[in-house]
Amino acid sequence: MSAGNMSHDLGPPRDPLAIVIPVTVVYSLIFITGVVGNISTCIVIKKNRSMHTATNYYLFSLAISDFLLLLSGVPQEVSYIWSKYPYVFGEYICIGRGLLAETSANATVLTITAFTVERYIAICHPFLGQAMSKLSRAIRIIVLVWIMAIVTAIPQAAQFGIEHYSGVEQCGIVRVIVKHSFQLSTFIFFLAPMSIILVLYLLIGVHLYRSTLVEGPASVARRQQLKSVPSDTILYRYGGSGTAMSFNGGGSGAGTAGLMGGSGAQLSSVRGRLNHYGTRRVLRMLVAVVVCFFLCWAPFHAQRLIAIYAPARGAKLRDQHEFVYTVMTYVSGVLYYLSTCINPLLYNIMSHKFREAFKAVLFGKKVSKGSLNSRNNIESRRLRRALTNSSQTQRFSIESAEQPKPSIMQNPTNKPPVAAQYAMIGVQVN
């Protein structure tokens, strides 16, 4: 869509340099940042097997869609800024760009919606999430997302073609295949997903708030002591058995079966306290992604609706509408492509392990489990100290008279299982 679509008067072929140059610089920075960030995201996830989790698979899909959106849109967008007409790329490129852009946009919003549902199930219905293979389910959902994105993009893209205004060629809508297609797109791929996401986060927030009330003030105080510890993943090593259990919701449950000599009630209490704080960090990360998505994409859909309804307002208001449309075109264009480089930045800032793996890839170092966990060894000691200090006011050990005494078979070392060890490893948050 171009400003020329609002009037048969195409106007000047280029806006003033005071607008064109800054916008070009912004587009260039977005393109470089987005391409580097999304390609690096894919490489980091692919090379590090410990990051082959459901959440990272969604992130991988998101990076692919963002990269395709940048590749198909920014070069032609910059070309259009410097020369609004004539369109020199031909009809095939015009239609192909529409197909790729619509597919990528649809895949982005569907992916964000999908892993929001994934987080809701993991936090509010953990037993349901553990009953199914999260990784295999994520793969199936991602494949379905891309199929839906392509199928719904084809009718949109097929409407594009080369149109002629006063003998000047432009890329625009030349045929109507689906009536009210852009209105439907706004509802299906923006309003409905955002409503679903907001409702699910509200339910998650209520669930976490109720969990806080159940745990009581002592648990809140303990969580305050854990705030200095990164929560990529917290593992609990119990009674020297050497069996670790992930508290990020992404494990298979094998760690639970390997625990020896422990109290189920105590283990549940420890798991709840540690997992609660880690879940809140995961939640903040996903909320940030969703909020940025809304801020970046709302102007894009608003600009589309203005382009559709503004011409019907009448000739007297046409100039005002054209000014608003022109401003919205620049604002929505910048924010539209800015969304493609925000996701890698958000995940790098909020995930210690991803940040370490990202730096390792950038500096050409081999991505290894040990290199990603070097800092976590220090943080594990901080975690142990925090838990030791908190136990002075309320010990969460199994030294209670209500707990059965461990047998020799349960504790081969014949040491009291109160010697619980806590360790941090660099498993990506799932």
Curated annotation (Swiss-Prot):
Glycans are attached at N5. The chain crosses the membrane at residues 17-37, 54-74, 97-117, 141-161, 186-206, 282-302, 322-342. Disulfide bonds join C94-C171. GO terms for biological process: G protein-coupled receptor signaling pathway; negative regulation of peptide hormone secretion; neuropeptide signaling pathway; triglyceride homeostasis. It is a multi-pass membrane protein. Residues 38-53, 118-140, 207-281, 343-430 are cytoplasmic. Keywords: Cell membrane, Disulfide bond, G-protein coupled receptor, Glycoprotein, Membrane, Receptor, Transducer, Transmembrane, Transmembrane helix. GO terms for molecular function: G protein-coupled receptor activity; neuropeptide receptor activity; pyrokinin receptor activity. Residues 388-397 have a biased composition (Polar residues). It comes from the Eukaryota. It is found in: Cell membrane. The keyword S-adenosyl-L-methionine does not apply. CDD domains: 7tmA_capaR (cd15134). PANTHER family: G-PROTEIN COUPLED RECEPTOR, PYROKININ-1 RECEPTOR. Belongs to the G-protein coupled receptor 1 family. Receptor for the neuropeptide CAP-3/pyrokinin-1 (TGPSASSGLWFGPRL-amide). Also activated weakly by other neuropeptides terminating in the sequence PRL-amide including pyrokinin-2, Hug-gamma, and ecdysis-triggering-hormone-1. The activity of this receptor is mediated by G proteins which activate a phosphatidyl-inositol-calcium second messenger system. This is Pyrokinin-1 receptor. The lineage of its organism: Eukaryota, Metazoa, Ecdysozoa, Arthropoda, Hexapoda. The gene is PK1-R.
